[in-house]
Each structure stands twice: as C-alpha cells, then as structure tokens.
C-alpha cells in the first residue's frame, strides 16, 4: 500500500496555495503544475 502525504504548494504566479496529496514533494509540485497548467518552476513547497 502506497503512503500519500498532504503537501502545501504555492503557485508563484498567482499566489494561490493548494493542498495536494502525493507520494513525495516532487510529485506534489509536478501534479499542481500539470493540473493548473503552469511551469514546474512556478511552484514552491510551503
């Protein structure tokens, strides 16, 4: 069974903070970037 963790990711272009379930921090940032159609570099863990 995979363990998922809730990460808080900020989208730098909009200032929006999103909670995202993922296996690790990279997966969380990639998921938010893909879902909100922004570049990975425009996301930051908080």
What are these regions (language model features)?
Residues 17-21:
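Well-ordered beta-strand positions in beta-sheet-rich domains
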Residues 6-8, 29, 33-36:
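Basic/aromatic-rich interaction segments and small domains that mediate binding to polyanionic partners
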Residues 34-46:
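Short, mixed-charge low-complexity intrinsically disordered segments
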Residues 1-16:
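Short aromatic-glycine-(Arg/Gly/Cys) micro-motifs in beta-strand/loop hairpins
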């Amino acid at each position: 069974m995979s363990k998922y963790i809730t990460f808080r990711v900020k989208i730098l272009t909009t200032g929006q903070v999103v909670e995202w379930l993922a296996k690790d921090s990279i997966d969380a940032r990639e998921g938010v970037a893909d879902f909100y159609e922004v570049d990975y570099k425009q996301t930051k863990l908080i």
